[in-house]
Amino acid sequence: MDKIQKIKGFADLFPPDSTVFSFIEETARQVFSRYGYKELRVPVLERTELFCRSIGEETDVVQKEMYTFPDRKGRSLTLRPEATAGVMRALVEDGRASEGLAKYFAYGPMFRYERPQKGRMRQFHQIDVEAVGSPDALLDAEVLLMLDQYLRALGLKNLVIELNSLGCKACRPIFLDTLREFLKGMHKEQLCEDCMRRKLSNPLRVLDCKVPQCKEFTADAPKITDHLCPDCADHFAAVRRVLDGAGLAYTLNPRLVRGLDYYVRTTFEIVSGDIGSQSSVAGGGRYDGLVHSIGGPDVPGVGFACGMERLALLIDKKAEPAPDFALVVLDAIGLERGLLLAQELRAAGFSGEAPYAAKSAKSQMRAADKSGAAFCLVLGSDELAAGTVVVKNMRAGGQETVSQDILPAHLRARLVAGQED
């Protein structure tokens, strides 16, 4: 019978990769909670309409990349390609989107049908952060400062913050008309097939195209930051003042538009020079019309997402911590007592394993040595009768016979002594 294998573009995570993912998640909890964010968990499966209305019908995500299928009643469902829309749906449905400032973070798997490559999988994982209820530039700046602190807590270096403003519903249409006029005369020798389609329907996305010829022929395209209305210009200036005051370096990138249609005003991306072509590790911005677009109140919001696979590429993978003990049972009659002794040690805070079936002393000692355990605990018939155990120090050498009653205290003292040496 043929082996069943995982789907292309999906991955199994074993240590040390799974350990790195746990570190990314735990660090997120620690940092974001200091800013008042609470953890939220939302479904991975949503109605397709949610993403069509929030992300935009003309985006590559909706047009090409979503995993969409009918359920048994013919309703169109989609595995989430990003987290923000689902978080907004949850806040609206639960009535939390209109209760003042709502600050939440979430994490988990997303799904996009893309060509698998380093740092980009069909199932990928994101850390998602959303703050809903305030239009203020200071919140935008604080979100960026929090993101910077989070990435620093992960130990990441060689990162660049790219910053832009996309204007609002008052000034962006004027800029889009100017951009369409600039793109109107361009032909297929100058723009890729996607950009030829987008230049009228979604011209902003042409600026974000990564195809070299498109970048070359749009190098002199008008800049949206030159067409901001006074309110958007003041908002963007306030964001930059706070970042400057905090000493946070950034680069202005007038071509930064992101891949989702709901962004307005502040938009940003964090890029790394250490992971090749998939250089973006985090990105986000303001989305003041998103909640209203999915049937909620007209409230503003700002947030970001971090790609966990890409973060993991930048984090040093440490070896799994070695266990404190490995129990060796010399006689089958001692297996049950050995298991109970191991249980007592775990309850006292130690990590380690005990055998479940009779094995030779040689194979057990070999396994104990391979595990890297600090102590090998030997339980034979003599020790079983006397209520003792032989403690072999696998790092400092030597061995002692110790009463089982004081074993936890003995191991703790030896571990402390070993740390001090």
Swiss-Prot record:
Gene3D superfamilies recorded: Anticodon-binding domain, Bira Bifunctional Protein, Domain 2
Subcellular location: Cytoplasm
Catalysed reactions listed for this entry: tRNA(His) + L-histidine + ATP = L-histidyl-tRNA(His) + AMP + diphosphate + H(+)
Cellular component terms per the entry's GO annotation: cytoplasm
Protein's UniProt keywords contain Cytoplasm: yes
Gene Ontology biological process terms from the UniProt entry: histidyl-tRNA aminoacylation
EC number: 6.1.1.21
Any one GO molecular-function label of the UniProt entry: ATP binding
Keyword presence, Isomerase: no
Main location: cytoplasm
CDD domains: HisRS-like_core (cd00773), HisRS_anticodon (cd00859)
InterPro entries associated with the record: aa-tRNA-synth_II, aa-tRNA-synth_II/BPL/LPL, Anticodon-bd, Anticodon-bd_dom_sf, His-tRNA-ligase, HisRS-like_core, HisRS/HisZ, HisRS_anticodon
UniProt enzyme class: ligase
Keywords assigned: Aminoacyl-tRNA synthetase, ATP-binding, Cytoplasm, Ligase, Nucleotide-binding, Protein biosynthesis
Domain of life: Bacteria
Subunit field text: Homodimer.
Entry-linked PANTHER family: HISTIDINE--TRNA LIGASE, MITOCHONDRIAL-RELATED, HISTIDYL-TRNA SYNTHETASE
Family statement: Belongs to the class-II aminoacyl-tRNA synthetase family.
Protein name: Histidine--tRNA ligase
Organism: Solidesulfovibrio magneticus (strain ATCC 700980 / DSM 13731 / RS-1)
